[in-house]
Design a protein with these regions (language model features):
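C-terminal motif of bacterial Sec signal peptides marking the signal peptidase cleavage site
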Residues: 18-23
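Bacterial N-terminal signal peptides that target proteins for export
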Residues: 1-9
Length: 214
């Protein structure tokens, strides 16, 4: 788990160097009876363990490049493991496909393809920063209820928490961000502005994680 946390922190620093931000909302696309992720997983599978990285997603190419770097880092650190990534926003999936020409699949398609591929152990690592409603829906509904209970109860599953899940995590991330930007902040004319997606309810307790980092 500490390895996961370390690479989440590294990913956060990489992501903050990207200049683009986007707001994606879910839509109700027509579902196909054929799961296109099945073929991808079947062709990729080399080991008995898989890691599925889950992120809300983005429509900016700079951010998509960062995701590719995150995947490469995980493959380097977990060489005996197959690594996959899924966006949880369907709108981000569609827009990323349109801008890059690269096929991307919905979360349930990845989960079913991985579950049917014969893996004995699956780790689902959230790349969400705060434990907001998107993260809770992922872990409580998509992973726990659907994947672990209803679909594949025989698979050993590890759920990796979001980046700012504990007070210690918050302190470490704040220190990483400070160290990354301190040289630029030495000049009084410079400021650093970090933006997060947040939650629609301003009273949602996960939103306080941002002020805690500050």
């Amino acid at each position: 788990m500490k390895n996961f946390k370390f690479y989440l922190m590294a990913a956060l620093v990489a992501a903050t160097t990207c200049t683009g931000f986007t707001s994606c909302s879910d839509d109700d696309d027509a579902e196909s009876t054929v799961n296109p992720a099945t073929r991808v997983v079947a062709e990729t599978k080399k080991y008995d363990t898989a890691i599925l990285l889950c992120t809300f997603g983005s429509t900016y190419n700079e951010s998509l490049d960062v995701y590719n770097e995150i995947i490469a880092d995980f493959r380097k650190q977990f060489p005996q493991t197959d690594i996959y990534m899924s966006f949880t926003s369907r709108t981000c999936i569609g827009r990323a496909e349109a801008s890059t020409g690269e096929a991307r699949y919905k979360l349930d398609q990845w989960l079913k393809a991985i579950g049917d591929a014969g893996y004995t152990r699956v780790a689902v690592q959230s790349l969400h920063v705060i434990p907001g409603e998107e993260y809770l829906s992922l872990m409580n509904t998509d992973i726990k209820k659907n994947f672990m209970i209803d679909w594949y109860p025989h698979i050993d599953v590890l759920k990796g928490a979001n980046l700012l899940s504990t007070d210690d995590d918050t302190d470490e991330v704040a220190q990483v961000l400070y160290n990354h930007y301190k040289d630029k902040l030495a000049e009084k004319k410079n400021i650093v502005l970090l933006m997060g997606h947040g939650n629609p309810d301003v009273n949602y307790n996960a939103n306080t994680k941002y002020s805690e980092v500050q």
